[in-house]
Amino acid sequence: LGRFFFWLCRTRPEVVKKRLLDELPELLPEGYDIEKHLTPRYNPWDQRVCLAPDGDFFNAICEGKADIATDHIAEIKENGVELKSGEFIEADIIVSATGLDLNFLGNIEVTVDNEAVEPANLLNYKGMMYSGIPNLLASFGYTNASWTLRCDLTSKYLCRLINYMDRKDISRVMPTPDMSQVEFEPLLDFSSGYVVRKSAELPKQGSIKPWVMYQNYIADIFLTRFSALQDGALKFTK
């Protein structure tokens, strides 16, 4: 169901957005400003979609236990937050929900043959390896599903790869794209600020398999479990 909803958001975003907004008046107090507080500038799944189990978030608003302030922050003060509109919100605790800083491999400095590797020049292979870096697999989960799903596929693919290399007495494997056939695209098709801010510094995905970074668990099952290891993109050496 989650996969179908994601597909629908990508293929019919205006239809899904309208349906979601049409359901809100029944969940909120009469006259609540839905356009101001609950109508984002982007379409569903251009950024993450938040779910409210059993409508608990909307119940809290109806009961006066929660409220939404849609504005820009002018200043954080000792006892609350001042907004650009001049409104002041008193607060005992402020929880930061933004400001994530994406870093490739946790800012590990990677070198190959004493040459520093620039992450922005790398091409992702099957969501787990990178062009120009030998013998490296890294888990990178899904933006639209459980993060561990692709981690599980990556670990199983790694076992396949190691067993194959052991049988063939191979010590080195490296994704090597034909650059005349592949166009670079952003690694994540996501408009969240923390992604956009770092997009230019992160590795890229390609326009064709196996360089595409799928956000589709079913597609990745076939790509990792049933595809040939000798696919022309991996370069094996002894």
Question: Where are the model-predicted features located?
Answer:
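Dinucleotide-binding/catalytic capping subdomain of oxidoreductase cores
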Residues: 1-78, 159-188
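Hydrophobic/aromatic beta-strand patches that form the interior of the parallel beta-sheet core
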Residues: 67-69, 95, 137-139
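Core beta-strand elements of the Rossmann-like FAD/NAD(P) dinucleotide-binding domain
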Residues: 84-93
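Glycine-rich, N-terminal phosphate-binding loop of Rossmann-like dinucleotide-binding domains
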Residues: 85, 98-99, 140
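Flavin (primarily FAD) binding-site architecture
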Residues: 96-113
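Alpha-helical scaffolding within the catalytic cores
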Residues: 119-125
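C-terminal, flexible cofactor-proximal segment of oxidoreductases
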Residues: 124, 135-238
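Short glycine/proline-enriched loop/turn "hinge" motifs that connect secondary-structure elements
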Residues: 126-132
